[in-house]
Amino acid sequence: MPLYEGLGSGGEKTAVVIDLGEAFTKCGFAGETGPRCIIPSVIKRAGMPKPVRVVQYNINTEELYSYLKEFIHILYFRHLLVNPRDRRVVIIESVLCPSHFRETLTRVLFKYFEVPSVLLAPSHLMALLTLGINSAMVLDCGYRESLVLPIYEGIPVLNCWGALPLGGKALHKELETQLLEQCTVDTSVAKEQSLPSVMGSVPEGVLEDIKARTCFVSDLKRGLKIQAAKFNIDGNNERPSPPPNVDYPLDGEKILHILGSIRDSVVEILFEQDNEEQSVATLILDSLIQCPIDTRKQLAENLVVIGGTSMLPGFLHRLLAEIRYLVEKPKYKKALGTKTFRIHTPPAKANCVAWLGGAIFGALQDILGSRSVSKEYYNQTGRIPDWCSLNNPPLEMMFDVGKTQPPLMKRAFSTEK
């Protein structure tokens, strides 16, 4: 908490910024350079053998309400240690977040925690605030999927988005498959036992740790050779020499022998083109083709990559090499008028870029007040604005019912000179 708040400043208290990701949640205060905590988006329930994921889209409303209520209570009273009634809230969300989830989340915040206001901010748009630019092609490589969305002059171009189920979850599934098929374990009983005979499945936390500590992305030339050897039908393609094997401790009593070939081949699923010739790299190019032709050059020269999966060593270098390799193919060579692609380096780790953008936005008190949904409006209507809904109320009705609008709000929406 900033010092001036502790000295009894009469100004409005800084907002709480929450980036509720499917794997990890980032939480902190507006105006700060980093989140106060990064914790798994799970809760532990009595009688359940495994932790329960909080971000779920296919469960009923009351169950989701219960999960979110318990998780946000942990955020406020175990990590942030502040009164939720005193501070506005900025929620960083995906543009593809289902209405069912966001409505349940806002109901928890307004009805249970009684927060003064809530702002739902798109993660792709918030990422640009950290760079001070208005236009970019933003790729978010998260846990469930990779989602690309062009932003032009501060406006998301919603009809040009693209997504693929290629993210941390897909990497974990591939990693577990290869570990169970190829790896051995040393125990106190015997050496080099097959992994399935020791444990039927690998816990999610262990997969995450192995991925972060041992896996990396090969360069383009090596990656193409690995893919050719993997799909080798006639037996002519040889795999490049693998990196060193790694011994990974399990439970303090077992040693898992991870083959070097697994360390670099797991991540190739992000760049292997499927039956429809789609990969993480083609997502960007396909989205670029859908954009208006006069915006493509500017978007191609301003690529922004966020999300925890993109933090793998070598990911950005490989992504740029893949794009430059694919753009020479007939499918894209004629359609795209530019061959220049550049990736920005945001002033934060890739998994915290969207949170930092929300912290910057939340520190602008006048703008935050003019863009947030107030508690009074929500109590009157029970609704929140949704970009995919055609019957949203007028903008000026959503903010601080019965109160005068902030000066910036007046300037933005008034016709007076």
Curated annotation (Swiss-Prot):
CDD domains the record matches: ASKHA_NBD_Arp10
Keyword vocabulary terms for this entry: Cytoplasm, Cytoskeleton
Cell compartment(s), UniProt: Cytoplasm, Cytoskeleton
Pfam family, one: Actin
GO cellular component: axon cytoplasm; azurophil granule lumen; cytosol; dynactin complex; extracellular region; ficolin-1-rich granule lumen
InterPro entries referenced in this protein's UniProt entry, alphabetically: Actin (IPR004000), ATPase_NBD (IPR043129)
Cytoplasm as UniProt keyword: yes
Listed GO biological process terms: retrograde axonal transport of mitochondrion
Domain of life: Eukaryota
Presence of the UniProt keyword Cytoplasm in the record: yes
SMART domains the UniProt entry points to: ACTIN (SM00268)
Purpose of the protein: Part of the dynactin complex that activates the molecular motor dynein for ultra-processive transport along microtubules.
Family statement: Belongs to the actin family.
Subunit-structure text: Subunit of dynactin, a multiprotein complex part of a tripartite complex with dynein and a adapter, such as BICDL1, BICD2 or HOOK3. The dynactin complex is built around ACTR1A/ACTB filament and consists of an actin-related filament composed of a shoulder domain, a pointed end and a barbed end. Its length is defined by its flexible shoulder domain. The soulder is composed of 2 DCTN1 subunits, 4 DCTN2 and 2 DCTN3. The 4 DCNT2 (via N-terminus) bind the ACTR1A filament and act as molecular rulers to determine the length. The pointed end is important for binding dynein-dynactin cargo adapters.
Name this protein carries in UniProt: Actin-related protein 10
Native species: Homo sapiens (Human)
Gene behind this protein: ACTR10
